[in-house]
Design a protein with these regions (language model features):
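Internal alpha-helical transmembrane segments
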Residues: 115-123, 128-134, 145-154, 174, ...
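Aromatic-rich transmembrane-lumenal/periplasmic boundary elements in polytopic membrane proteins
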Residues: 150, 232-348
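Hydrophobic alpha-helical membrane-insertion segments
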Residues: 63-71, 134-154, 230-241, 356, ...
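C-terminal substrate/ligand-recognition segments
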Residues: 389-456, 487-511
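N-terminal signal-anchor module of multipass membrane proteins
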Residues: 2-45, 53-57, 62-69
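Membrane-interface interhelical loops and short amphipathic "cap" helices
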Residues: 1-20, 47-54, 78-100, 152-188, ...
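Membrane-interfacial loop-to-helix junctions in multi-pass inner-membrane proteins
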Residues: 46-64, 90-96, 100, 120-138, ...
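Membrane-interface helix-loop-helix modules in multi-pass inner-membrane proteins
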Residues: 65-135, 152, 461-463
Length: 524
């Protein structure tokens, strides 16, 4: 058991490492791709050589980021087979479909048109080149769609049926998987956060060049485009985040409770805006969960259910199976103890089904199919030793959520301010306080990355211990490998990905420092 725990923890750590490194490149690809396409559209409309130079500058940075992002993403898909082979077998028919479409359709689409985008200047018509640029940007979004649909299915399994004869889940509705509320909100929330990062990146880099008194006209134009895309992105990110909260409240109430550090729910539940958790607080005790808190009255009920008087269950309520309607009447839900018992019944029925199949007992198989279907939705709970095993890391989820919301709120104010200054203060670089604004813009780049990664920490840590919500826990999904193997590959990936990140930053900084946009004006 100890070795299993070590393997699970190290495999989770390895996947978190590679996923976070990969995510450092993905949102910039999503956001910068759209910005470059818009800039080239302006160039084609105006025929201005200055817009051409500006387009090529940002396109160069896009290409550097895209190349490193592809390199970091390849390893992720292989990890499902090496470290999580039971999961791959259990849901491969479903989970593999969107990933296969992403690889065959979206990635090849990006790879084909990015070649035209970079090497087609002067070789294809301007309109065809613009089309290639837009298709590259759209291809990146389509690529994200399939990956995010797969991730959403892990958190809210729909559109499938379990086949006890093959011990695998089989797809019955592809559209249900792709169009589930969880998938739709996750896609738009993630892509719009990429637009936000792309906009902030353009504004921040432009402000760095303004600090150096270089390429002033180009930077001021870039700031306008970046600020518009960033503002649209952050507003839509917040809007889709609201929808995501509702789906989480419905399908993953334990995650919502962990996000709030909420142990005992109430009708008209307050939302903790700022708070410090009590590290001594345990499930079932009477200690105050917070050392300090500033709350918004009824905010969590509004966020979770769009109803200020609705009941939001806490961790103790969810474990005990307690809930209440808006009029205060108790609503029966299934306690975690009962879920564990039903999970064991499903597990036992599966074993008996396998034995009946070997003996050719079709009558027993028919009866066992009914039992399996009755309890299958709780199969994952069979692997839990106690109900508390289903509680995610509360401090990490709680604080990550507040980091995400806090920085996101700052970015909204910053981008709106940037838009105002870009149009009302056309000679922004000459203002006496401009240096402070430029430095704030530069600092906003890493802050946006922290915000983005924090969102993924909430999404992934908050759903633990499930790799497939309620159906399969991490311990059930793990491959039969040694902890030493995972530790070795973890160290290799850590060194490799760190080297790639350093290379990416170094190349980008070198290009930003040395590239004079005027030198690109006459480039064809």
């Amino acid at each position: 058991m100890e070795n299993l725990i070590n393997v699970v923890d190290w495999s989770r750590a390895q996947f978190a490492l590679t996923a976070i490194y990969h995510w450092l490149f993905v949102p910039l690809t999503l956001g910068l791709g759209i910005i470059v396409a818009i800039m080239e559209s302006i160039y084609l409309h105006t025929k201005s050589e200055r817009w051409l130079a500006t387009t090529k500058f940002w396109m160069l940075l896009f290409g550097i980021n895209f190349a490193i992002g592809v390199a970091t993403g390849i390893i992720l898909e292989f990890e499902f087979g090496t470290n999580w082979s039971n999961y791959s077998w259990f849901v491969g028919d479903i989970f593999g479909a969107p990933l296969a479409i992403e690889g065959i359709l979206a990635f090849f689409m990006e790879s084909t048109f990015i070649a035209v985008m970079f090497f087609g200047w002067g070789k294809v018509s301007p309109k065809f080149h613009l089309t290639a640029t837009w298709l590259t940007a759209i291809g990146a979004c389509i690529s994200a769609l399939w990956i995010l649909a797969a991730n959403a299915w892990m958190q809210c399994p729909v559109g499938m049926e379990f086949n006890p004869e093959t011990m695998r889940n089989e797809m019955v509705s592809f559209s249900a998987i792709v169009t589930s509320p969880m998938a739709v909100y996750k896609f738009f929330h993630t892509v719009m956060s990429g637009w936000t990062l792309g906009g902030i990146f353009v504004v921040g880099v432009s402000c760095w060049m303004l600090l150096k008194r270089r390429n002033i006209e180009h930077c001021l134009r870039s700031i306008k485009v970046g600020a518009w895309i960033g503002t649209i992105g952050i507003v839509l990110t917040m809007a889709t985040g609201d929808g995501s909260a509702v789906t989480v409240a419905e399908h993953q109430p334990m995650k919502l409770a962990a996000m709030e550090g909420l142990y005992d729910g109430n009708s008209g539940q307050d939302l903790v805006a700022i708070g410090v958790l009590n590290p001594e607080k345990k499930v079932g005790d009477n200690l105050d969960p917070y050392i300090f808190e500033i709350s918004l009255p009824k905010g969590l009920s509004i966020l979770a259910n769009h109803d200020k008087d609705s009941f939001v269950p806490g961790i103790n309520d969810i474990i005990a199976g307690r809930s209440f309607s808006t009029d205060g009447k108790p609503v029966n839900t299934i306690s975690y103890s009962e879920r564990m018992e039903r999970g064991r019944k499903a597990q036992s029925a599966l074993r008996q089904f396998g034995e009946a199949k070997r003996q050719g007992d079709t009558l027993a198989m028919s009866q066992l199919r009914i039992d399996i279907k009755k309890h299958f939705n709780f199969l994952g709970y069979a692997s839990l030793q106690s109900p508390s095993d289903a509680i995610p890391n509360i401090p990490l989820t709680f604080y990550s959520f507040r980091v995400m919301v806090g920085i996101g709120s700052f970015l909204l104010v910053f981008l709106l301010t940037t838009l105002f200054l870009a149009y009302k203060r056309p000679e922004l670089e000459k203002s006496k306080w401009s240096k402070w604004f430029f430095r704030l813009a530069i600092i906003s780049i890493p802050l946006t990355y922290i915000c983005s990664v924090s969102g993924w920490v909430v999404a992934e840590v908050g759903r633990q211990p499930w790799i497939n919500q309620d159906l399969m826990s991490n311990s059930m999904a793990i491959s039969d490998i040694s902890a030493g193997y995972v530790q070795t590959t973890f160290c290799i990936f850590a060194v490799l990905f760190t080297a790639l990140l350093i290379a990416d930053i170094s190349i980008m900084v070198k290009q930003i420092r040395k590239k004079s946009l005027e030198n690109l004006n006459s480039t064809k």
